[in-house]
């Protein structure tokens, strides 16, 4: 909880389903997503828990309709997560963000968003490695999660696709092909054991079914 792993989205999806069930109704995924977006303000977190795989979604400009598309996540792309022994307050995470961003940074992130979708759709590791870079929030939030910069250095010689914040943090996500996972995980264990407060390490696969 409170470390960027989507617990709020999962809780909302479960609560909406339960509210329908207790009234003798069976909600569709569209029902849950629509109500969940009204509660959270945006659909991404609820959609991820609800639908599984990789979800690209947004709100229609004309009404409250949610437009979403599901992409098959490559089976061999595994997710390692480092969870530090602290949580981040939402207000603190937001305070470090600038009120305005450079035009070129916004454009760079828009380009990379499209290219990340292409990398998943094409199962292209080289492309993912090249584009899994953020210029809108990580440069500011890494001061709150110093482990991010440290792990990027620790893993710089390993064939990972990326090392990024999970949500706003404090959890850190490492994307790696299954064939390299064990060696990367071993390096993470060595690093974790050297820390004053040993972080948790999660060895995960992407859920493909959702709720």
Q: Where would I find each of the regions flagged by the language model?
A:
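Short acidic/polar active-site loop segments enriched in Thr and Asp
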Residues: 161
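Short beta-strand->loop micro-motif that forms the acidic, two-metal-ion catalytic signature
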Residues: 171-177
């Amino acid at each position: 909880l409170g470390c960027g792993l989507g617990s709020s989205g999962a809780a909302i999806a479960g609560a909406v389903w339960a509210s329908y069930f207790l009234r003798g109704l069976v909600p569709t995924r569209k029902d849950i997503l629509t109500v969940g977006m009204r509660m959270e303000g945006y659909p991404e977190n609820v959609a991820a828990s609800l639908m599984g795989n990789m979800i690209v979604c947004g709100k229609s400009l004309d009404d409250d309709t949610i437009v979403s598309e599901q992409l098959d996540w490559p089976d061999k792309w595994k997710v390692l997560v480092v969870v530090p022994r602290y949580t981040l307050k939402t207000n603190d995470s937001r305070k470090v963000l600038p009120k305005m961003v450079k035009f070129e940074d916004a454009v760079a992130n828009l380009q990379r968003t499209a290219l990340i979708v292409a990398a998943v759709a094409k199962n292209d590791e080289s492309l993912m490695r090249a584009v899994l870079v953020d210029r809108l929030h990580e440069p500011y939030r890494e001061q709150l999660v110093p482990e991010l910069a440290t792990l990027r250095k620790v893993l710089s010689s390993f064939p990972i696709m990326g090392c990024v914040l999970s949500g706003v943090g404090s959890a850190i996500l490492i994307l790696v092909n299954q064939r390299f996972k064990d060696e990367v995980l071993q390096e993470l264990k060595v690093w974790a054991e050297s820390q004053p407060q040993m972080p948790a390490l999660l060895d995960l696969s992407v859920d493909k079914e959702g709720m």
